[in-house]
Swiss-Prot record:
Fusarium verticillioides possesses 2 unlinked loci, FDB1 and FDB2, necessary for detoxification of antimicrobial compounds produced by maize, including 2-benzoxazolinone (BOA). The FDB2 cluster arose as a duplication of the FDB1 cluster with rearrangement and expansion by incorporating additional genes. Pfam families: CoA_transf_3. This is Acyl-CoA transferase FVEG_12629. It comes from the Eukaryota. One of its GO terms (molecular function) is acyltransferase activity. Disruption phenotype: Does not affect tolerance to 2-benzoxazolinone (BOA).
Amino acid sequence: MTTKTSNETYGAGTVVDSEFSPLPAECERILRIFAARTPGFTKDEALLSGVNFHGDDLPCIPGPIKSQAVTAVLHAMVGIVGLEILHLRGVTTDNQIDIDVNHAGLYPATAALVDIDGVTGPEVIKLPTVPQWDKDRASNSPLVYRATAIYETADSGVWFQLHGSLDSWKVLALLGIGKDLDSEIRTNDAAYELIQERVRKYRAREIEQLVVEKGLSGSIVYSPEEWRQTEMGRSLSRHPLVNYKQKSHCATLAPASFPVLEDKRPLAGIKVVELTRIIAGAAAGAALASLGAEVIRVNSSKLKDYTPAQPSSLMAGKKTIDLDLEDPADHKKLMQLFEQADVILQGYRLGSLARRGFGLEAALELANKRGRGVVYVDENCYGPDGYYAERPGWQQVADAAAGSSYVMGQSFGFPKGQGVLPSLPISDMSTGILTALTIMCGIRDRAKFGGSYHGHASLTAYNMATLDSEVRLYQREVVQKISDKYEFPTWSSDVHVAPLYYSILDAWGKKSELIKDEKHYIHFSDSVFGSDLRVLGPVVRYDKEEYSPKWNSPPVPFCHHEFTMFSNQ
């Protein structure tokens, strides 16, 4: 059993283990912490002890943050709620769940773990079968590339995470950098130097205010303690990580029974509308699809999105349609899907869909009319309330805000205050499984108690959970052992997330069998991307294949299908 020591090794507010606990045992410890803190989560020891965490003792993700353990635990919690639903459906009385912690370690790299007919790595998105949804990022412009990085401000020891989002030129214009400079700046290093020169003219609060005023994304790099002392940090701290509640004015709706189907997976027959972009929401939808839900993902072909998601398991098991909510005909089509849906998963800025008639209140009204509850879950960067709740945000921004980037910088020995990205899209992918867990709790409770449910999951809340004083951080000597085993590269504040995670995969491939283990993958021979598509499979495994998570159809591009209603079940 590990004990804690508040020695602030990685900055203010950090708590470090006094001794190392093997990863499977650490997962068991954290599972019980999360179970005790989560309202409505089972305290049944048969279910908690039924989780079999197994795999390597040493984590495979670089750095002191226990990302791999927390991600494995969130998958285990999904598995537990899935079993509770299976019990309600009368499918099984089994309590056993298998979580391979090595597989959970690969999970944050899902979008990069794609093999199309032998093509892997960054070459995948260059294939003609993969549609391009963000041509600016594919433009090879160094300025666009460096618009997303961490820069030092005029305040000594205070850094800022700039983020180009899906329109880097808006962010660059804020700094007085226009497209006219694009032809002059021909290297990534030159671009970083120019942007650093401009950012250093501002104090941290000044550039934060500019970004907020323009509706753009970015954050000061806070230490964990500094973030907790902000008003937004305090707002998030008031909510549990798995954050959902029954809506009181819908409580009279009767419990919603599950359909009796040949498909024995927990969510078979559950209808999900996925209104998301980029990674976290897509990961949530994919998890629900693997558990049997019918997921219809709605994109607009007029909006940019994350190209690498398409051939990965982020898009497996779904139908993807193209709707423009400014078009009255498409607006009507989405309303028809809302009328049928059991679950609304939305990952746009808070209030954005409500202004178009597709917010929580509209969904609750439709549920009341049909006499069957709905589960509506928002996924965003900053959480359900507080002065930043409606701001746009990305994984890197949440990492900077909550203190994850600060901790990584300290683990590398950089000066106090300098931020460095975590190695993978960890908060994105893990918030995805957190979102799926939140939805599943609502589905379970709708079946038990009736009513409708509203939930919320956020990137920053996930990061705060990994930096919690009870979860703790790894000691420096453990971090060094991880680095020595895989010979990970070091990186600095200028790194871009895509080449960073490919470098992590390269280290895994050279120094271990981790990414070569076929049991972590599934193959599709009927994919539009190629004749043999290999992607990362679901992490949760049950004792019997008939109700274990799986995808019945391969990943597809965005907007791939014609408009369709949910199947009648």
